[in-house]
A protein has these predicted regions:
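A solvent-exposed interaction/effector surface
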Residues: 3-201
Length: 201
C-alpha cells in the first residue's frame, strides 16, 4: 500500500482516494493515559483483527495477507494556520491506519464488534473513513516533531519556487505518517512523512 518512502527533499504527489480506520480526538498526544493513547489502542485492535481475520470463521472477499501500514495523523488547531507545536493541548486530530482496498465497510463493522468483545476494549470510536487527499507536497522529516517547522519552511519555499501554494483548510489538513516506532528509536532519528495539500498559485 506504501510502495516507497519519500525523499528528504520536497516532492509533489497526487494521492489517490483510500479507506482508513480512523479515531478522532483532541488534546496533547503526550498525556499519560489520555485520548491519544486510547485512540491508538482502538486503531491497532481493529487493524489487527482485520489482519488476522483469515484465522477465524469470518471470510473477507479477496483477502490476502498483508502488513499493517504505519500510523498516520491529521492535525489542526482552531483559529491557527498550520500547527503550533508549543500549544499541544489545543491539538485536534484524526489518527488513521490505511486499509487494503479489499476491506469493505461490512468487514470493518465486523472487526469493530469482534475487537470490542475479544479485547474487552470499547472500539465504538473507530470509524471507516474515506479520504481523497489529491494534490500534495510531501517530504521525509528526520528528527523530533518539535523541529518540524524548519522542514515545513523548506516545503513552503519549494512551493513558492514551483508555482504552488499551501491549501490547508478545514477539509484538507496537515498530515503526518510515522515511519519510526517512537518507543524504540531516539527522537533525533525519527522518520516522519509530512504531507500538505496544495493548489496552483
Amino acid at each position: 500500500m506504501y510502495k516507497r518512502q519519500p525523499k528528504n527533499k520536497p516532492e509533489i504527489v497526487n494521492v489517490p482516494k483510500a479507506n482508513y480506520i480512523a479515531v478522532r480526538g483532541k488534546g496533547n498526544p503526550n498525556e499519560e493515559g489520555g485520548a491519544y493513547q486510547q485512540a491508538i489502542s482502538v486503531l491497532y485492535a481493529v487493524a489487527y483483527t482485520l489482519k488476522m481475520s483469515y484465522k477465524t470463521d469470518y471470510k473477507i472477499e479477496g483477502f490476502f495477507e498483508y502488513v499493517v501500514p504505519p500510523l498516520e495523523g491529521f492535525w489542526w488547531q482552531d483559529d491557527v494556520v498550520g500547527v503550533d507545536y508549543t500549544n499541544k493541548s489545543a491539538f485536534n486530530w484524526i489518527f488513521v491506519i490505511r486499509l487494503p482496498d479489499f476491506i469493505s465497510k461490512a468487514d470493518f463493522n465486523w472487526a469493530v464488534e469482534t475487537a470490542t468483545k475479544k479485547k474487552k476494549l470499547d472500539c465504538s470510536s473507530a470509524e471507516y473513513l474515506t479520504i481523497d487527499e489529491g494534490l500534495c507536497v510531501q517530504i521525509m522529516h528526520i528528527g523530533s516533531f518539535d523541529n518540524e517547522s524548519a522542514t515545513v519552511a523548506l516545503m513552503d519555499t519549494y512551493l513558492d519556487q514551483n508555482g504552488y501554494v499551501n491549501d490547508i483548510n478545514k477539509d484538507r489538513l496537515h498530515h503526518e505518517i510515522y515511519m519510526s516506532d517512537a518507543r524504540k528509536v531516539a527522537p533525533e532519528k525519527w522518520k516522519t512523512v509530512i504531507r500538505h495539500p496544495i493548489k496552483k498559485a
